[in-house]
Protein backbone atom coordinates (compact mmCIF):
# COMPACT_ATOMS: atom_id res chain seq x y z
CA UNK A 1 0.00 0.00 0.00
CA UNK A 2 1.55 3.35 -1.04
CA UNK A 3 1.81 6.43 1.18
CA UNK A 4 -1.09 8.30 -0.48
CA UNK A 5 -3.45 5.38 -0.03
CA UNK A 6 -2.42 4.99 3.63
CA UNK A 7 -3.08 8.66 4.28
CA UNK A 8 -6.45 8.42 2.53
CA UNK A 9 -7.53 5.49 4.68
CA UNK A 10 -6.31 7.20 7.85
CA UNK A 11 -8.29 10.36 7.08
CA UNK A 12 -11.37 8.28 6.22
CA UNK A 13 -11.21 6.34 9.49
CA UNK A 14 -10.67 9.57 11.41
CA UNK A 15 -13.73 11.14 9.79
CA UNK A 16 -15.88 8.11 10.63
CA UNK A 17 -14.69 8.12 14.26
CA UNK A 18 -15.36 11.86 14.55
CA UNK A 19 -18.90 11.46 13.26
CA UNK A 20 -19.53 8.58 15.67
CA UNK A 21 -18.12 10.45 18.67
CA UNK A 22 -20.12 13.59 17.89
CA UNK A 23 -23.25 11.46 17.61
CA UNK A 24 -22.46 9.81 20.92
CA UNK A 25 -21.88 13.11 22.73
CA UNK A 26 -25.05 14.60 21.23
CA UNK A 27 -27.00 11.74 22.83
CA UNK A 28 -26.51 13.27 26.26
CA UNK A 29 -29.10 15.65 27.70
CA UNK A 30 -28.90 19.28 26.64
CA UNK A 31 -26.48 21.20 28.83
CA UNK A 32 -24.52 18.12 29.87
CA UNK A 33 -20.94 18.82 30.91
CA UNK A 34 -19.27 16.62 28.35
CA UNK A 35 -15.75 17.75 29.15
CA UNK A 36 -15.55 19.96 26.08
CA UNK A 37 -17.34 22.96 27.54
CA UNK A 38 -17.51 24.78 30.84
CA UNK A 39 -21.20 24.23 31.59
CA UNK A 40 -22.33 22.27 34.59
CA UNK A 41 -25.58 21.09 33.02
CA UNK A 42 -28.76 20.30 34.90
CA UNK A 43 -30.71 17.45 36.47
CA UNK A 44 -28.31 14.58 37.20
CA UNK A 45 -25.32 16.49 35.90
CA UNK A 46 -22.67 17.81 38.25
CA UNK A 47 -19.18 19.25 38.42
CA UNK A 48 -17.67 16.05 37.09
CA UNK A 49 -15.31 16.26 34.14
CA UNK A 50 -13.72 13.70 31.84
CA UNK A 51 -10.29 15.31 32.27
CA UNK A 52 -10.42 15.69 36.04
CA UNK A 53 -7.25 13.63 36.68
CA UNK A 54 -5.33 14.44 33.50
CA UNK A 55 -2.65 16.32 35.43
CA UNK A 56 -2.92 14.89 38.93
CA UNK A 57 -2.99 11.20 37.90
CA UNK A 58 -2.37 10.83 34.16
CA UNK A 59 -1.99 7.02 34.27
CA UNK A 60 -5.27 6.48 36.11
CA UNK A 61 -7.28 4.92 33.31
CA UNK A 62 -4.41 2.66 32.26
CA UNK A 63 -4.04 1.40 35.83
CA UNK A 64 -7.76 0.69 36.15
CA UNK A 65 -7.87 -1.07 32.80
CA UNK A 66 -4.90 -3.26 33.73
CA UNK A 67 -6.42 -4.14 37.10
CA UNK A 68 -9.75 -5.15 35.61
CA UNK A 69 -8.02 -7.16 32.89
CA UNK A 70 -5.94 -9.09 35.45
CA UNK A 71 -9.06 -9.96 37.41
CA UNK A 72 -11.01 -10.87 34.27
CA UNK A 73 -8.31 -13.30 33.11
CA UNK A 74 -8.73 -15.25 36.35
CA UNK A 75 -12.52 -14.97 36.56
CA UNK A 76 -14.63 -13.83 33.61
CA UNK A 77 -17.66 -13.46 35.88
CA UNK A 78 -15.94 -10.52 37.60
CA UNK A 79 -17.06 -8.30 34.71
CA UNK A 80 -20.71 -8.65 35.72
CA UNK A 81 -19.75 -8.23 39.37
CA UNK A 82 -17.94 -4.93 38.80
CA UNK A 83 -20.82 -3.57 36.76
CA UNK A 84 -23.28 -4.55 39.48
CA UNK A 85 -21.03 -3.04 42.15
CA UNK A 86 -21.32 0.37 40.48
CA UNK A 87 -25.11 0.06 40.21
CA UNK A 88 -25.49 -0.92 43.87
CA UNK A 89 -23.19 1.89 44.95
CA UNK A 90 -25.04 4.61 43.05
CA UNK A 91 -28.52 3.54 44.13
CA UNK A 92 -27.71 3.94 47.84
CA UNK A 93 -27.05 7.57 48.76
CA UNK A 94 -25.35 8.26 45.43
CA UNK A 95 -22.16 7.19 43.65
CA UNK A 96 -19.89 7.73 46.64
CA UNK A 97 -18.06 4.44 47.15
CA UNK A 98 -20.14 3.72 50.26
CA UNK A 99 -20.74 0.11 49.22
CA UNK A 100 -17.03 -0.56 49.71
CA UNK A 101 -16.97 0.43 53.38
CA UNK A 102 -16.66 -2.24 56.05
CA UNK A 103 -18.91 -2.13 59.10
CA UNK A 104 -17.60 0.10 61.87
CA UNK A 105 -18.52 1.15 65.40
CA UNK A 106 -20.43 4.08 63.91
CA UNK A 107 -22.50 2.34 61.23
CA UNK A 108 -23.59 -0.93 59.66
CA UNK A 109 -22.48 -0.80 56.06
CA UNK A 110 -24.07 -1.92 52.82
CA UNK A 111 -22.08 -5.10 52.22
CA UNK A 112 -24.33 -7.15 54.47
CA UNK A 113 -27.63 -5.64 53.36
CA UNK A 114 -30.05 -8.24 52.02
CA UNK A 115 -29.52 -7.40 48.31
CA UNK A 116 -25.72 -7.52 48.73
CA UNK A 117 -24.94 -10.25 51.27
CA UNK A 118 -23.11 -13.20 49.72
CA UNK A 119 -23.93 -11.69 46.34
CA UNK A 120 -22.13 -8.44 45.53
CA UNK A 121 -18.43 -8.99 44.91
CA UNK A 122 -15.38 -7.34 43.39
CA UNK A 123 -14.26 -5.53 46.53
CA UNK A 124 -10.77 -7.03 46.38
CA UNK A 125 -10.39 -6.01 42.74
CA UNK A 126 -11.21 -2.39 43.55
CA UNK A 127 -8.87 -2.45 46.56
CA UNK A 128 -6.03 -3.85 44.45
CA UNK A 129 -6.55 -1.16 41.81
CA UNK A 130 -6.68 1.49 44.53
CA UNK A 131 -3.36 0.24 45.91
CA UNK A 132 -1.74 0.52 42.47
CA UNK A 133 -3.12 4.02 42.04
CA UNK A 134 -1.89 5.10 45.48
CA UNK A 135 1.63 4.13 44.42
CA UNK A 136 1.44 6.60 41.54
CA UNK A 137 -0.96 9.25 42.85
CA UNK A 138 -1.33 9.18 46.65
CA UNK A 139 -4.68 10.37 48.06
CA UNK A 140 -5.76 11.75 44.70
CA UNK A 141 -8.33 9.40 43.13
CA UNK A 142 -11.58 8.52 44.88
CA UNK A 143 -12.78 4.96 45.30
CA UNK A 144 -16.10 6.06 43.79
CA UNK A 145 -14.34 7.05 40.57
CA UNK A 146 -12.44 3.76 40.50
CA UNK A 147 -15.72 1.85 40.74
CA UNK A 148 -17.19 3.89 37.87
CA UNK A 149 -14.14 3.32 35.66
CA UNK A 150 -13.94 -0.38 36.52
CA UNK A 151 -17.57 -0.85 35.50
CA UNK A 152 -16.86 0.73 32.12
CA UNK A 153 -13.78 -1.44 31.57
CA UNK A 154 -15.77 -4.54 32.52
CA UNK A 155 -18.33 -3.79 29.83
CA UNK A 156 -15.66 -3.10 27.21
CA UNK A 157 -13.80 -6.32 28.04
CA UNK A 158 -16.94 -8.34 27.35
CA UNK A 159 -17.53 -6.69 23.99
CA UNK A 160 -19.81 -3.87 25.08
CA UNK A 161 -19.60 -0.14 24.33
CA UNK A 162 -16.93 2.26 25.49
CA UNK A 163 -18.06 5.55 26.99
CA UNK A 164 -16.11 8.46 28.48
CA UNK A 165 -16.59 8.47 32.27
CA UNK A 166 -16.93 11.90 33.90
CA UNK A 167 -14.70 12.02 36.99
CA UNK A 168 -14.20 13.98 40.18
CA UNK A 169 -16.44 12.10 42.61
CA UNK A 170 -15.56 12.19 46.30
CA UNK A 171 -15.92 9.33 48.77
CA UNK A 172 -18.41 9.17 51.61
CA UNK A 173 -17.47 8.75 55.26
CA UNK A 174 -20.38 6.46 56.05
CA UNK A 175 -22.66 3.78 54.64
CA UNK A 176 -26.15 2.52 55.42
CA UNK A 177 -27.38 -1.06 55.50
CA UNK A 178 -30.94 0.21 55.95
CA UNK A 179 -30.74 2.45 52.87
CA UNK A 180 -29.44 -0.46 50.80
CA UNK A 181 -32.32 -2.66 51.92
CA UNK A 182 -34.79 0.08 51.01
CA UNK A 183 -33.39 1.58 47.81
CA UNK A 184 -32.12 -1.36 45.78
CA UNK A 185 -34.68 -2.98 43.45
CA UNK A 186 -35.59 -6.60 44.12
CA UNK A 187 -35.69 -9.26 41.38
CA UNK A 188 -39.22 -10.04 42.58
CA UNK A 189 -40.57 -6.48 42.34
CA UNK A 190 -43.21 -5.25 39.94
CA UNK A 191 -42.13 -2.88 37.19
CA UNK A 192 -44.12 -0.05 38.76
CA UNK A 193 -42.13 -0.32 41.99
CA UNK A 194 -38.79 -0.62 40.23
CA UNK A 195 -39.53 2.40 38.06
CA UNK A 196 -40.52 4.43 41.12
CA UNK A 197 -37.10 3.76 42.66
CA UNK A 198 -35.39 4.89 39.46
CA UNK A 199 -37.52 8.03 39.18
CA UNK A 200 -36.70 9.00 42.77
CA UNK A 201 -33.05 9.14 41.70
CA UNK A 202 -33.70 11.17 38.56
CA UNK A 203 -33.82 8.27 36.12
CA UNK A 204 -36.84 7.05 34.13
CA UNK A 205 -38.52 4.02 32.58
CA UNK A 206 -36.16 4.04 29.62
CA UNK A 207 -33.21 3.81 32.01
CA UNK A 208 -34.90 0.83 33.70
CA UNK A 209 -35.09 -0.99 30.36
CA UNK A 210 -31.62 0.03 29.21
CA UNK A 211 -29.75 -0.70 32.43
CA UNK A 212 -31.55 -4.03 32.81
CA UNK A 213 -29.65 -4.98 29.66
CA UNK A 214 -26.59 -5.40 31.88
CA UNK A 215 -28.11 -8.78 32.72
CA UNK A 216 -26.73 -9.99 29.40
CA UNK A 217 -23.56 -10.83 31.37
CA UNK A 218 -25.32 -11.31 34.71
CA UNK A 219 -25.99 -14.26 36.97
CA UNK A 220 -28.64 -14.98 39.58
CA UNK A 221 -28.63 -17.22 42.61
CA UNK A 222 -30.89 -20.22 42.07
CA UNK A 223 -33.29 -19.32 44.87
CA UNK A 224 -34.35 -16.31 42.79
CA UNK A 225 -35.59 -18.38 39.85
CA UNK A 226 -36.48 -21.82 41.24
CA UNK A 227 -40.15 -20.95 41.67
CA UNK A 228 -40.33 -20.53 37.89
CA UNK A 229 -38.72 -23.92 37.34
CA UNK A 230 -40.73 -26.07 39.71
CA UNK A 231 -43.75 -24.31 41.22
CA UNK A 232 -44.87 -21.33 39.17
CA UNK A 233 -47.64 -19.47 41.01
CA UNK A 234 -48.26 -22.50 43.21
CA UNK A 235 -49.09 -24.76 40.27
CA UNK A 236 -46.44 -27.37 41.01
CA UNK A 237 -45.36 -26.94 37.38
CA UNK A 238 -42.76 -24.78 35.58
CA UNK A 239 -43.59 -21.39 34.16
CA UNK A 240 -45.22 -22.23 30.79
CA UNK A 241 -42.99 -19.70 29.03
CA UNK A 242 -39.85 -21.50 30.20
CA UNK A 243 -41.43 -24.91 29.63
CA UNK A 244 -41.93 -23.96 25.99
CA UNK A 245 -38.14 -24.07 25.66
CA UNK A 246 -37.46 -27.61 26.84
CA UNK A 247 -33.70 -27.39 26.34
CA UNK A 248 -33.44 -24.21 28.41
CA UNK A 249 -35.69 -25.57 31.15
CA UNK A 250 -33.69 -28.79 31.34
CA UNK A 251 -30.42 -26.87 31.59
CA UNK A 252 -31.79 -24.60 34.31
CA UNK A 253 -33.09 -27.56 36.31
CA UNK A 254 -29.66 -29.19 36.07
CA UNK A 255 -28.06 -25.99 37.34
CA UNK A 256 -30.70 -25.35 40.00
CA UNK A 257 -32.11 -28.67 41.24
CA UNK A 258 -35.13 -28.45 43.52
CA UNK A 259 -33.21 -28.85 46.78
CA UNK A 260 -32.31 -26.25 49.39
CA UNK A 261 -28.59 -26.84 48.92
CA UNK A 262 -28.78 -25.38 45.40
CA UNK A 263 -30.15 -22.01 46.52
CA UNK A 264 -26.79 -20.24 46.34
CA UNK A 265 -25.69 -21.78 43.04
CA UNK A 266 -25.54 -19.44 40.05
CA UNK A 267 -27.48 -19.47 36.80
CA UNK A 268 -26.54 -17.28 33.85
CA UNK A 269 -29.27 -14.79 32.95
CA UNK A 270 -28.25 -15.09 29.30
CA UNK A 271 -27.14 -18.69 29.02
CA UNK A 272 -26.26 -18.51 25.32
CA UNK A 273 -23.67 -15.73 25.70
CA UNK A 274 -23.05 -15.16 29.41
CA UNK A 275 -19.62 -13.54 28.93
CA UNK A 276 -20.54 -11.48 25.87
CA UNK A 277 -22.12 -8.06 26.26
CA UNK A 278 -24.75 -8.10 23.52
CA UNK A 279 -28.47 -7.62 22.97
CA UNK A 280 -29.42 -11.28 23.47
CA UNK A 281 -31.07 -10.34 26.78
CA UNK A 282 -33.74 -8.45 24.83
CA UNK A 283 -34.13 -11.26 22.31
CA UNK A 284 -34.81 -13.56 25.27
CA UNK A 285 -37.45 -11.19 26.61
CA UNK A 286 -39.15 -11.12 23.21
CA UNK A 287 -39.25 -14.93 23.41
CA UNK A 288 -40.67 -14.76 26.96
CA UNK A 289 -37.64 -16.45 28.52
CA UNK A 290 -36.24 -13.68 30.69
CA UNK A 291 -35.25 -15.49 33.89
CA UNK A 292 -35.93 -12.88 36.56
CA UNK A 293 -39.44 -11.75 37.36
CA UNK A 294 -38.10 -8.20 37.18
CA UNK A 295 -36.81 -8.89 33.66
CA UNK A 296 -39.88 -10.45 32.11
CA UNK A 297 -42.12 -7.84 33.74
CA UNK A 298 -40.69 -5.30 31.28
CA UNK A 299 -42.98 -6.86 28.69
CA UNK A 300 -46.09 -5.93 30.69
CA UNK A 301 -45.71 -2.21 29.93
CA UNK A 302 -46.29 -1.02 26.32
CA UNK A 303 -43.54 1.61 26.44
CA UNK A 304 -41.01 -0.74 27.99
CA UNK A 305 -41.98 -3.55 25.63
CA UNK A 306 -41.48 -1.27 22.62
CA UNK A 307 -37.97 -0.44 23.83
CA UNK A 308 -37.22 -4.12 24.37
CA UNK A 309 -38.30 -4.82 20.79
CA UNK A 310 -36.11 -1.99 19.45
CA UNK A 311 -33.04 -3.22 21.33
CA UNK A 312 -33.66 -6.83 20.30
CA UNK A 313 -33.53 -5.70 16.67
CA UNK A 314 -30.80 -3.06 16.89
CA UNK A 315 -27.70 -3.86 18.99
CA UNK A 316 -26.08 -0.53 18.08
CA UNK A 317 -29.06 1.36 19.52
CA UNK A 318 -28.79 -0.64 22.74
CA UNK A 319 -25.06 0.04 23.03
CA UNK A 320 -25.54 3.76 22.48
CA UNK A 321 -28.40 4.08 24.95
CA UNK A 322 -26.64 1.91 27.52
CA UNK A 323 -23.63 4.23 27.50
CA UNK A 324 -25.87 7.27 27.97
CA UNK A 325 -27.79 5.67 30.85
CA UNK A 326 -24.58 4.59 32.56
CA UNK A 327 -23.33 8.18 32.57
CA UNK A 328 -26.69 9.34 33.95
CA UNK A 329 -26.56 6.72 36.68
CA UNK A 330 -22.95 7.59 37.47
CA UNK A 331 -24.01 11.14 38.28
CA UNK A 332 -26.54 10.20 40.97
CA UNK A 333 -25.90 12.04 44.22
CA UNK A 334 -22.21 12.64 43.63
CA UNK A 335 -20.09 14.69 46.02
CA UNK A 336 -17.46 16.97 44.52
CA UNK A 337 -15.10 19.75 45.54
CA UNK A 338 -14.54 19.83 49.30
CA UNK A 339 -17.44 17.50 50.11
CA UNK A 340 -16.56 13.99 51.22
CA UNK A 341 -13.01 12.64 51.25
CA UNK A 342 -10.45 10.74 49.20
CA UNK A 343 -9.95 7.45 51.02
CA UNK A 344 -6.53 5.87 51.22
CA UNK A 345 -8.12 2.41 51.41
CA UNK A 346 -11.58 1.86 50.02
CA UNK A 347 -12.86 -0.26 52.90
CA UNK A 348 -12.19 2.38 55.55
CA UNK A 349 -13.57 5.93 55.83
CA UNK A 350 -10.35 7.55 57.02
Curated annotation (Swiss-Prot):
The lineage of its organism: Eukaryota, Viridiplantae, Streptophyta, Embryophyta, Tracheophyta. The record marks 84 as: Transition state stabilizer. SUPFAM superfamilies: Heme-dependent peroxidases (SSF48113). This is Peroxidase 10. It comes from Arabidopsis thaliana (Mouse-ear cress). Binds 1 heme b (iron(II)-protoporphyrin IX) group per subunit. Binds 2 calcium ions per subunit. Belongs to the peroxidase family. Classical plant (class III) peroxidase subfamily. Disulfide bonds join 57-137, 90-95, 143-346, 222-256. Its EC number is 1.11.1.7. It comes from the Eukaryota. Its cofactor is heme b; Ca(2+). One of its GO terms (cellular component) is extracellular region. Expressed in the whole plant, with the highest expression in roots. There are 73 peroxidase genes in A.thaliana. It holds the Pfam family peroxidase. GO terms for biological process: hydrogen peroxide catabolic process; response to oxidative stress. It is found in: Secreted. Keywords: Calcium, Disulfide bond, Glycoprotein, Heme, Hydrogen peroxide, Iron, Metal-binding, Oxidoreductase, Peroxidase, Secreted, Signal. Heme b binds at residue 215. The active site is at 88 (proton acceptor). One of its GO terms (molecular function) is metal ion binding. Ca(2+) 2 binds at residues 216, 270, 273, 278. Substrate binds at residue 185.
